[in-house]
Swiss-Prot record:
An accessory protein needed during the final step in the assembly of 30S ribosomal subunit, possibly for assembly of the head region. Essential for efficient processing of 16S rRNA. May be needed both before and after RbfA during the maturation of 16S rRNA. It has affinity for free ribosomal 30S subunits but not for 70S ribosomes. The keyword rRNA processing applies. The lineage of its organism: Bacteria, Bacillati, Cyanobacteriota, Cyanophyceae, Synechococcales. GO terms for cellular component: cytoplasm; ribosome. The keyword rRNA processing applies. Its main location: cytoplasm. GO terms for molecular function: ribosome binding. The gene is rimM. It is found in: Cytoplasm. It comes from Synechococcus sp. (strain JA-2-3B'a(2-13)) (Cyanobacteria bacterium Yellowstone B-Prime). Gene3D superfamilies: PRC-barrel domain, RimM. Keywords: Chaperone, Cytoplasm, Ribosome biogenesis, rRNA processing. This is Ribosome maturation factor RimM. GO terms for biological process: ribosomal small subunit biogenesis; rRNA processing. Binds ribosomal protein uS19.
Length: 179
C-alpha cells in the first residue's frame, strides 16, 4: 500500500504488544477516538502485506500513561501473534470517513495542494505537523521547506476543488525560510 492509497485511511500504527492476551498498543493518527474504542471492522497492514487484512476491533481503551490506545482485535489471541503486528498500520476504508465540521479538513486532502502567496505559486503542501496547532509543511520548487501554522488568519482560502490554498503569513515569515 502506498502511504496515500486513496482507498484507505491511516488511523493508527501498532507500536508494541501489550500483555499476554494479544492486546496491541496503538499510536493514534485520527481525531476520532471512537475508532479505537467502538467495536467494528478494522484492517491491519504490514509493509510486507500486499493488501490490508481484516481484524475487527473487539474492544479498546485509552492508555493515558503512554498516550496510546490499547486495542484487542479478532485473530490476535496472544502476545506472540501480537508481536508480529508491531509496526503495522491500522486502517479503515476511505468510505468510512467521519463527517467534519465546516472548515475542517482531512490531512490527506491537504497533502499535495498547490500553495499560493501574494498570487504567486509558493510550493506544495508536503506534510502536516501536529504540534499543538497543525502546521503546514510546504515544499518549494527548489525543494526548500516553509512552515506555516494552519490557522484561518494565515491560510484564509482552502479550495479542495481547485487543488489550492492561499496563505497570508506575517511579513518576513516566508523569507525567513527561503533566506
Amino acid at each position: 500500500m502506498m502511504a496515500r492509497d486513496p482507498d484507505w485511511l491511516l488511523v493508527g500504527q501498532v507500536v508494541a504488544a501489550h500483555g499476554l492476551r494479544g492486546w496491541l498498543r496503538v499510536r493514534c493518527w485520527s481525531d476520532f477516538p471512537e475508532r479505537f474504542t467502538e467495536p467494528g471492522p478494522r484492517w491491519l497492514q504490514r509493509d510486507t502485506d500486499p493488501e490490508p487484512l481484516l481484524h475487527p476491533l473487539i474492544e479498546g481503551q485509552f492508555f493515558p500513561a503512554k498516550g496510546l490506545y490499547l486495542v484487542r482485535l479478532e485473530g490476535i489471541p496472544n502476545r506472540t501473534v501480537a508481536e508480529t503486528w508491531v509496526g503495522a498500520r491500522l486502517l479503515v476504508p476511505a468510505s468510512h470517513r467521519l463527517p467534519l465540521q465546516p472548515e475542517e479538513y482531512h490531512y490527506r486532502d491537504l497533502i499535495g495542494l498547490a500553495v499560493y502567496h501574494q498570487g504567486e505559486l509558493l510550493g506544495q503542501v508536503s506534510g502536516i505537523l501536529a504540534a499543538g496547532q497543525d502546521v503546514l509543511e510546504i515544499t518549494t520548487s527548489d525543494h526548500r521547506q516553509v512552515l506555516i501554522p494552519f490557522v484561518k488568519a494565515l491560510v484564509p482560502v482552502v479550495d479542495l476543488e481547485k487543488g489550492a490554498l492561499h496563505v497570508q503569513p506575517p511579513p518576513g515569515l516566508v523569507e525567513s525560510f527561503l533566506g
